[in-house]
Amino acid sequence: MQQIDMPAVVAASPDSNVTDLLIDRVTLSPDLALFALPQADGSWKDVTAAEFLDQVRALAKGLVAAGIQPGDKIGLICRTRYEWTLLDFAVWFAGAILVPVYDTSSPHQIHFDLSDSGAIAIITETAEHYARFDEVHAELPLVSKTWNIDRGDL
C-alpha cells in the first residue's frame, strides 16, 4: 500500500478542540447571527453567537447534572434541525460523544448503532423515533437515560 504524507496546511494546537471554534466566534463577534429560527407567525428570529453559546452551556450543564460524564456516548435520532447543532456543541462541551442514528433507521439498526457504540443515553426527536427505539430498549441495558426533543425534555 502506498502512503503519502503532506504537511498540515494550518497548524492545529494539540490543546484545542471543536468547542474553541464557538468560543472564538463569540469573542470576535458576539452579536453575529449564526442561525435564524422560523417563528409561528412565519417570521424568522436570529440567534446570535452569544445567545447560541448561552444555550449550549445551559444544555451542557443539564446533561452533566443528569449524570453524563466525559467519554459517555449519547445516541441521537433526529432529522437535520437547529437542535441537532445545539446538541452537538452541548455534548462536546460536556466532554461526551454524540452518536448520530439516521432518523429512518429501523429498530434493528437503532439497536446496532447504540449497542456497537456503547451509548448510555438516547435523544429522540419525535414520538415515532422514540417508539422505534423503545422496541429494542430492553435489549440495550446500557441506555438508561432518554430525552425527546418534541416533548420538550431538553
Predicted features and spans:
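Flexible, non-catalytic linker and terminal segments flanking ANL/adenylate-forming cores
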Residues: 1-18, 38
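Flexible, glycine- and charge-enriched loops at secondary-structure boundaries
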Residues: 11, 45, 49, 100
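A short N-terminal helical cap/helix-turn-helix that marks the beginning
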Residues: 13-35, 54
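Aromatic/hydrophobic pocket-lining residues that form π-stacking "cages" and hydrophobic walls in ligand
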Residues: 22, 87, 133
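Proline-centered helix-kink/hinge sites
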Residues: 30, 79, 98-100
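Conserved AMP-binding/adenylate-forming core of the ANL superfamily
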Residues: 35-89, 106-111
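Structural core segment of the AMP-binding/adenylate-forming
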Residues: 66, 93-154
